[in-house]
Amino acid sequence: MSRILPVTDPAEAAALDRLAARDDFEARRIRRMLSMPDLSRTPGSPLHELVERVKSVPSFKDFDIIAIPEIVPASISFDLFDFPPTHPSRSTSDTYYIDEKHILRTHDTVFWYYYLQLPEIKERIARGESLGTLCYGKVYRKDEIDRRHMNVFHQMGGWYLMPEDKGNLSLDDLKSVLSDVVKSIFGPNCIYRFNVDVFPYTDPSLEVEVQVEGEWVEILGGGMPKKSVLKNMGVEGYVGWAFGFGLERLAIISMKLPDIRLLWSEDERVKKQLVLDRPFVEVSKYPSVTRDISFVVPKDFVPNNYFDLIRDLGGDLVQEVKLLDRFENAEKFGSDKVSYTFRTVYQSFERTLTSAEVDKIHRAIEEDTKKRFSATIR
């Protein structure tokens, strides 16, 4: 029987208090993202159903279920997991920093640390017991805007550890477990394969691809936890395997979902369509509205930060943002400036948008672009 192990961290509570006291753009954005529901724990959501399917895999019958903080120290997320100092995940262009030391969690694998710090788990390790854990929930990364990506999404991961002196584990053991995971999601007749991959915290590592309408699509990654990473967390003499995957990607494949935003819809007509293994049928497709914006900004401009601005002001009405052009001209703009042109596609699942309401949003985006990025609108 699985046990649920919630983890509370006073450092997270303190970070939330500091965040609540701020009124800047970034603080408001982060509070909004944290307030979004955890769909992996929302009955009726296909992401919740995916979690339940994976939990039902026989190998996980007695695994602990751990719920971890959403605000974590960057040192735990990156240093303990052997992320190189120059890894892009450490950058503010990829990760949401609460302050210099704390971030919104970027990967659910951070549960390794929190699980191993629990007093009862330390006691089990001292007794030489084997350990198994599953973890799932929201993660946060700055990302592009299109029908397949959001900056708030959900991951699920798990691992198994056993003392070295009680036997050996190999990549074949992990492949056997992952085969059961894939079949629990896509059915016993699905076609899948394993490829070599690389992750900072596992070695060797692999990825799993599943065949979808004749094409191979990556769905999850895994590997054997590096001994150096386990040692960073105070554990030696153990071997194991681990895996992790994004829930949205699997749901999109299972339902042939045309847009990731549909997973968050409160429209009952849409929610009735969100059933795993059943192709989504659009209840009504309302026309999109397109607007372009061109501006000149300093060269340290980061597009991912601009995507966040558009999300802040356009919300769920923004379907996609495309970079149409990036242009440098020292004579025209100056050697320290660069010109960008972006195209934003607006579309509602519930109604036809008017030009007037889109223009209002777009004007607000123009004004905030000037304020936040010292931009000159062209």
Walk through the language-model features, giving the residues of each.
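Short secondary-structure junctions
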Residues: 61-69, 188-196, 377
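A conserved active-site cap/scaffold subdomain adjacent to cofactor or substrate pockets
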Residues: 150-151, 155-174, 179, 183, ...
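Conserved short secondary-structure elements within globular domains
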Residues: 129-141, 186-192, 319-326
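Class II aminoacyl-tRNA synthetase-like tRNA-binding/catalytic domains
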Residues: 2-152, 161, 216, 221-230, ...
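Extended C-terminal subregions enriched in glycine
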Residues: 169-176, 180-206, 296
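Short histidine-centered catalytic/ligand-binding loop motif
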Residues: 39-43, 156-172, 291-299, 354
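Amphipathic alpha-helical segments
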Residues: 46-61, 173-187, 305-312
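A carboxyl-terminal module marker
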Residues: 195, 200-378
